[in-house]
Amino acid sequence: MAVQVVQAVQAVHLESDAFLVCLNHALSTEKEEVMGLCIGELNDDLRNDPKFTYTGTEMRTVAEKVDTVRIVHIHSVIILRRSDKRKDRVEISPEQLSAASTEAERLAELTGRPMRVVGWYHSHPHITVWPSHVDVRTQAMYQMMDQGFVGLIFSCFIEDKNTKTGRVLYTCFQSIQAQKSSESPRGPRDFWSSSQHISIEGQKEEERYERIEIPIHIVPHVTIGKVCLESAVELPKILCQEEQDAYRRIHSLTHLDSVTKIHNGSVFTKNLCSQMSAVSGPLLQWLEDRLEQNQQHVQELQQEKEELLQELSSLE
């Protein structure tokens, strides 16, 4: 029985530069949820090892050892462009999934590693970090295509009532099939409980799902990867494109009068200025500071190189 019920993923290792991009994206807007896809690889090499072919009680021990190595490594993320901006809902279009798969293939060729889309992330502004019933349902549908697919949630713009300071919470989860309601001895569960029972549209009523929390670890890096740096720079462009799409969609309506169009143009300009102040400005300052640090580090390395060369020449 222990071999049949196997947890798809035991842990997630998120690179610190990818975590930085996710955090910047989540903090870019306070009114709507944002979303992106995670690119990485699933470490399950031992599962296909021919030496794990035991049976009976011994198989259970070996299976448990194999399961412990199923770790998702997230190396970079792809920021998605929202076609429909809502406060409590965000979705992935098939076109975006296809584009993300193409990008993962490009990264696989570039790095020589089996990169693919391994998960998705989205933000929860002003609400709990735990996934809603819609999140659990969406995650279950993704896992029907890939059992190793994981979901990340970043809860931001949360204020601690005691210290009056803001904080950001994050979690990683998957969906698993829950027990039938007839087998559960307990009564109704809390809406945000980890034992929440969810029905999937189009499935039988007894096929319910609940979330399971996946341990997530941030892997520190001294430098920032090129792919993550490109994603961070791409964020202001994507936000600007979203505002342009929304403005053009409203501006194309024929029944609007001149005053309304002028008002809409003013709102569009205001939103762009807000983005420049909240996203583009701090990002530019951070890049300039990072460049200055890198230049200083290069000077230190050059000085160290000269000192080592002098020591080497003195030994000769």
Curated annotation (Swiss-Prot):
Task: Give the record's keywords alphabetically.
Answer: Acetylation, Cell cycle, Cell division, Chromatin regulator, Cytoplasm, Cytoskeleton, DNA damage, DNA repair, Hydrolase, Metal-binding, Metalloprotease, Mitosis, Nucleus, Phosphoprotein, Protease, Ubl conjugation pathway, Zinc
- GO molecular function terms listed in the Swiss-Prot or TrEMBL record: cysteine-type deubiquitinase activity; enzyme regulator activity; K63-linked deubiquitinase activity; metal ion binding; metal-dependent deubiquitinase activity; metallopeptidase activity; polyubiquitin modification-dependent protein binding
Please list the residues that bind Zn(2+): H122, H124, D135
- Major subcellular location class: nucleus
Where is the motif JAMM motif annotated in this sequence?
A: 122-135
The protein's required cofactors: Zn(2+)
N-acetylalanine is carried by which residues? A2
Cofactor binding, note field: Binds 1 zinc ion per subunit.
Domain MPN residues, every copy: 12-179
* Entries under PANTHER family matching the protein: EUKARYOTIC TRANSLATION INITIATION FACTOR 3 -RELATED
Q: Write down the SMART domains for this protein, in alphabetical order.
A: JAB_MPN
**Family designation:** Belongs to the peptidase M67A family. BRCC36 subfamily.
**CDD domains of this UniProt entry?**
MPN_BRCC36 (cd08068)
UniProt organism field: Bos taurus (Bovine)
One Pfam family, please name it.
JAB
Q: State the GO CC annotations.
A: BRCA1-A complex; BRISC complex; cytoplasm; nuclear ubiquitin ligase complex; nucleoplasm; nucleus; spindle pole
Q: What is the protein name stated in its UniProt record?
A: Lys-63-specific deubiquitinase BRCC36
Localization (cell): Nucleus; Cytoplasm; Cytoplasm, Cytoskeleton, Spindle pole
Could you give the subunit structure recorded for this chain? Component of the ARISC complex, at least composed of UIMC1/RAP80, ABRAXAS1, BRCC3/BRCC36, BABAM2 and BABAM1/NBA1. Component of the BRCA1-A complex, at least composed of BRCA1, BARD1, UIMC1/RAP80, ABRAXAS1, BRCC3/BRCC36, BABAM2 and BABAM1/NBA1. In the BRCA1-A complex, interacts directly with ABRAXAS1 and BABAM2. Component of the BRISC complex, at least composed of ABRAXAS2, BRCC3/BRCC36, BABAM2 and BABAM1/NBA1. Identified in a complex with SHMT2 and the other subunits of the BRISC complex. In the BRISC complex, interacts directly with ABRAXAS2. Identified in a complex with ABRAXAS2 and NUMA1.
Q: Recorded E.C. number(s)?
A: 3.4.19.-
